Amino acid sequence: MQRGLPKVLHAPPSLLTGVLILSWALGSAAYASGSAPAEPPVAVAQSLAQEPALDGNVLDDPVWRAVTPARGFWQVQPAEGAPASERTDVYIGYTDDALLIGVVCYDEDPAGIIVSDSRRDSNLEEGDSFQVLIDTFRDGQNGFIFGTNPAGLEYDGQVTREGAGSTGPGGGMGNMQSGSGGGFNLNWDTTWSVRSAIGDHGWSAEMRIPFRSLRFAADEKPVWGLNFQRNIRRKNEIAYWSPLPRQYNLYRVSQAGALQGLDLPSLRNFKVIPYALGLAQRGGTRDGTDLSQELGVDIKYSLTPSLTLDATYNTDFAQVEVDDLQVNLDRFNLFFPEKRPFFLENAGVFSVGTPREVELFFSRRIGIAADGTAQPIAGGARVSGRLGANTNVGLLRMSTEETGAAAENNFTVARVQQELP
C-alpha cells in the first residue's frame, strides 16, 4: 500500500506577519507584567532630630532604623527591565541644615566588590558605585549628581538640559559643558561629605549634603525629582530606582522619581574666602629687604535660594587643578575645560553652541592674553540662577589688568533663557 506524502499548508504572508505581531505583543505584555512599574516611584524624606554618625555604617546606626528605605531597583543592563540582582536600600532624612542619605548595597559576594579609585571625581564606571540625582526645581531638565564607591570617593557635578551631548554619568568624559546649553559639568565641586564601609552584607555609604550647597525654590514643602543608580561591576550590571530605557542614563531628569516629605527652612549661603601672599627678597645687589604683598577675596552669596552672586577681587587661582597635557598637531585651538571655581556655578547658563566648534562664550579666554600668556584678573562679579519657574539668568562682568603688551580688558556677558511650556 502506497503512502501519500503529507500535505504542506502555505499560509499567506499577511497571516504570518499577523501571527508574529500577535506573539510579540503577548510576549511583551507578559514581560511587562513582571517588570518595572509604569508610574515613577516616590520616596519620603524623614525629619531627623539628630544626624547619624557619618561613618558609613548604616545598619548599625539607630537613627536610620526609624526611616523607611526606598528600594526596588531595575536593570538597564544586562537584562533590561528585570529586577536588580542585588538588593539596595536607600534611607533619606533631613535636618534644618542638611539632606542625609544612607544606602546599603547588599551583595551576596562581598569579596567580589570592585574598587578602582578613591580620588575625587574619578570614573565610577570602572568599579562598584552608587549615585544620586536630585532635581531641586522639578523642572525635568537640570539637577545635581552626587556619587560614591566602597572607598568613600566624592563625585559631584551639575546636569544641564538632561546632559545633552555628554557621556553617561560616572564616566571620565563628563568633565565639561557640552551640547547647546546643556551637558554635565564634573568640574563643579560643592561642600558635602561622604563615608563608606564594607561588611559581610556588602557595602554601605552615608552622604551629608548641606542645603546651602544646593539651589532650590523657596517652597516650604517642595517635591524634588530623585533617582538612584547602582553599578555592580563584576556583573556589568547597571540598575536604577526610577526605571529607564537602555538608551538613557541618570542624566534623564525628566524620568526621575519624586522625593516628598521635605520641610525646608529659608537659608542663605554666604561664603568669604580671603587670601594674603607675602614675599621678602634680600641679598645680591639689594641694599635692604624688598617686601611685596598681595591681598584678595572671593565671595559667594545666595540672593535667593535659587539665585547666586559670586564676586572676586584680585583673583588668585593658584589652587586650581592643573590642566591635562594636550599636544596640538594642527592649526586649530586647544580647548581646556574650565576648572576655576568662580566660573563653575551654573556654568550651563552661559553655555551656548557646540563645544570646540561654535561657542559664543568660552570663559577660559578670560585671564589669557592674545599671545597665550597669563593676564591677572583685577576683579569681577557674576549673578546666575533662576527667576521664577521657567526663567534662567546669567550676568558676568570681569576686568583684567594691563600687563606688557596686553591692554586692560573688560568682559561682559548676559543671558536670559525662557523655557516655554
Language-model features and meaning:
Residues 1-12:
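N-terminal secretory signal peptides that target proteins for export/translocation
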Residues 12-29:
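Bacterial N-terminal signal peptides
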Residues 31-419:
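Structural preference for beta-rich elements and adjacent junctions enriched in aromatics
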